Amino acid sequence: EAKGSGGKFFTMSTSGDVTNGNIKLYDNVIFCLSNQNLWTIYEPYYNTDQSLVLAAWDITDIFDAINDTRAQLVKLENSQIYSIKNLPTQAKLASYVKDMIPMIRLGEMYYIRAEYYNSKEDDTNAKNELAILRSAYNCPPDKLTGDFVDELINEVHREYLGEGQLFYYYKKMNKRPGYAMGSDDLFVLPRPDNENL
C-alpha cells in the first residue's frame, strides 16, 4: 500500500478480490486504457491451436510463494499455464475490469525506487522496496537472496504476467530470458523505412 502524510493513497488488491473477478488487480492500477472489445479480441487465443500459454512447466516455476495473490491470475489446464487476466468471467467485480488495459501499476513505483537504490549501490534498500511489494502480495519478503537484477526481473515477471511489459525490462537490464529463445535479434525492433537516412 502507498501512504502519504494523510494516510493511504492506494491499497493492493487481495486474493479475495481475484476470487470475486478482479482479474486485473485494479486497486493496483494507477493508469489504464480501455477497450470495450478486449474479451472478444482475446478469445481466439484461449483454448485453441493459437493459445497464448506461459513459458513454464509448473506454476511454481513462476511463483516462489503459493500464497502470492498474483498466482491466482494463472490457470493450469491441459498441462499448460494460461494467464486469466483477459478471460471472460461472470464474477461480481468482472464489470470493473473487463475492458481495462493496465499501463501503470503501483508495483512499478516500487520497481523504480528499487532501481534507483540499486544505481546508488544500496542493495539493502533496493531489495527492501521489492520486499515491501512482495509482502503486499502475501509473499515472504525474506526470499530475496539473489542478485538484485535477477530478483527484479522475477518480480516484474509476476507483476506484468501476460501484459507484455517484461520484454522492456529484459532490454533495459540487458538480460536474456531463462529459456531457449534463439537469437538476440528478437530484442531488436526493426527500424521503420521512413527513418532510414
Predicted regions and their residues:
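Acidic/polar-rich alpha-helix caps and helix-coil junctions
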Residues: 1-48, 52-54, 58-197
